[in-house]
């Protein structure tokens, strides 16, 4: 595998239009269940668990770099100031000159203020140019021969992605045991993935009885001398009964008899992806040998630490190896298993043709249509054992992923916000069997979100970056 910190690969990947576009979809919020404001994150997590669960979680929007107030971008302010300066200068010269400068100022004000489908005109032009660049690249790029068919759709989204295995040996009772951890990166980051499951119990507890502790996830942003880029939580849900079953089928009738049958998933997988930027954690990487080996060791340290904490919190945690990681990417992409199996042995390369396509409103893989939304507004969230908010986090996730879709995906990425807060960025993706079904599912999800106060913005012209943000790769950055 090429070096994850090679300067050439870093510059190539950072120039990708899709990654730049994904960065624009990021939102900083300071309302995570346990924002880490102290250097000692273990202490902060303990304080949050003991004394921070008395009331609902207030979600506050923090301005990100280049954003003033909450709505006005720095570039918009510059355009407004330039327009005002032109009018003032023209007025001091003469009225005819002021009239000419006023016309130019009017154009600048239109560019700065007038929205186009929720974006300023310069931003809309940049987004459209990035989409054209991705489409042009898609016409010429195919995964190389020998690519695993399960990984090929992800490579069509981000050609620089590579997977690898980091092997370690542990001594158990005088007997060395080899452990393998799968990692994925594109030259600018390296990620490992955990599969988190509830422990087997004779009676399954209620959905809200043991939610995944977000304070523990946020505490993994800094472990020892290692600072992660982000921690991503991904929940992939397939509904029950299957949407294609007739209403009078035995399975459909059985689920209707359940008290909460419409919210009962057939499959719900939870992954936690840990994303390391070797440049951000340069000191920790150098302390462990530098280069790709040092980055792998640093990521392995954080992965083991978080797995241990989640196990102590009452969950079964599995660190995915390389094959399991590729399978997780395929499941999250909702690829057609028949299409993947049909390419086994063919190499999945240039002879198999391209399997994905991005349109203005959808991303298609095989015969599945995906529509991705960015969470633009959060409701007041409640905590278990405390004063209720408008809705609890498990109920919110269950509501937006409970549509009768082929699959639904919820992604929550925690990163470093302003003033030592935790930045949260959320995305929702629904998958249908056709374009018309995806449209209907999108409307249903939008209506469900609106009923709770959750704001969803469909990522028109940015569906490919949106899908990348919902795959267990560590989140958009």
Language model regions located:
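Short loop/turn segments at secondary-structure transitions that flank enzyme active sites
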Residues: 200, 237-239, 276-280
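Membrane-embedded segments
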Residues: 213-216, 228-231
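Short secondary-structure junctions
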Residues: 222-228, 402-405
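N-terminal topogenic membrane-targeting module
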Residues: 111-213, 222, 449
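Membrane-proximal, solvent-exposed terminal domains/tails of membrane-associated proteins
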Residues: 2-3, 254-477
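N-terminal alpha-helical membrane-insertion module
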Residues: 1-149
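A short acidic (Asp/Glu
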Residues: 205, 239-248, 283-284, 329-333
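Structural flexibility/helix-modulation signal
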Residues: 229-266, 271
């Amino acid at each position: 595998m090429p070096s994850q910190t090679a300067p050439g690969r870093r510059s190539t990947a950072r120039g990708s239009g899709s990654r730049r576009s994904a960065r624009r979809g990021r939102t900083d919020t300071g309302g995570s269940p346990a924002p880490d404001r102290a250097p000692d994150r273990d202490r902060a997590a303990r304080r949050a668990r003991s004394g921070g669960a008395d009331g609902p979680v207030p979600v506050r929007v923090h301005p990100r770099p280049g954003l003033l107030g909450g709505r006005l971008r720095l570039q918009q302010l510059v355009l407004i100031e330039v327009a005002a300066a032109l009018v003032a200068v023209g007025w001091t010269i003469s009225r005819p000159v002021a009239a000419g400068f006023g016309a130019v100022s009017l154009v600048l004000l239109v560019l700065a203020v007038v929205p186009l489908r929720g974006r300023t005109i310069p931003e809309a032009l940049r987004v459209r140019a990035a989409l054209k660049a991705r489409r042009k690249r898609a016409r010429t790029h195919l995964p190389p021969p020998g690519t695993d068919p399960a990984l090929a759709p992800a490579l069509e989204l981000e050609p620089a992605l590579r997977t690898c295995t980091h092997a370690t040996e542990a001594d158990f009772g005088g007997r060395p045991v080899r452990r393998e951890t799968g990692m994925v990166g594109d030259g600018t980051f390296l990620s490992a993935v955990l599969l988190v499951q509830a422990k087997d119990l004779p009676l399954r507890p209620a959905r809200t009885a043991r939610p995944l502790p977000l304070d523990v996830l946020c505490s993994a942003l800094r472990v020892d001398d290692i600072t992660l880029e982000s921690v991503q939580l991904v929940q992939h849900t397939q509904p029950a009964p299957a949407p294609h079953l007739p209403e009078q089928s035995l399975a459909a009738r059985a689920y209707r008899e359940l008290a909460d049958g419409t919210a009962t998933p057939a499959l719900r997988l939870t992954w936690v992806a840990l994303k390391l930027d070797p440049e951000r954690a340069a000191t920790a990487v150098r302390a462990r040998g530098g280069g790709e080996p040092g980055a792998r060791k640093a990521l392995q340290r954080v992965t083991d630490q978080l797995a241990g904490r989640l196990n102590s919190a009452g969950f079964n945690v599995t660190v995915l190896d390389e094959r399991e990681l590729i399978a997780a990417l395929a499941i999250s992409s909702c690829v057609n298993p028949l299409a993947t199996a049909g390419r086994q042995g063919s190499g999945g390369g240039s002879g198999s043709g391209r399997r994905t396509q991005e349109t203005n409103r959808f991303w298609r893989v095989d015969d599945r249509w995906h529509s991705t939304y960015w969470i633009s507004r959060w409701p007041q969230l409640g905590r278990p054992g405390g004063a209720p908010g408008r809705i609890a986090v498990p109920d919110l996730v269950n509501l937006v992923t409970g549509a009768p879709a082929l699959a639904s995906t919820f992604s929550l990425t925690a990163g470093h916000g302003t003033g030592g807060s935790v930045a949260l960025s959320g995305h929702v993706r629904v998958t249908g069997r056709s374009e018309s079904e995806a449209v209907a599912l999108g409307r249903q999800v939008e209506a469900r979100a609106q009923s709770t106060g959750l704001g969803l913005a469909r990522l028109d012209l940015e569906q490919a970056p949106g899908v990348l943000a919902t795959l267990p790769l560590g989140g958009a950055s």
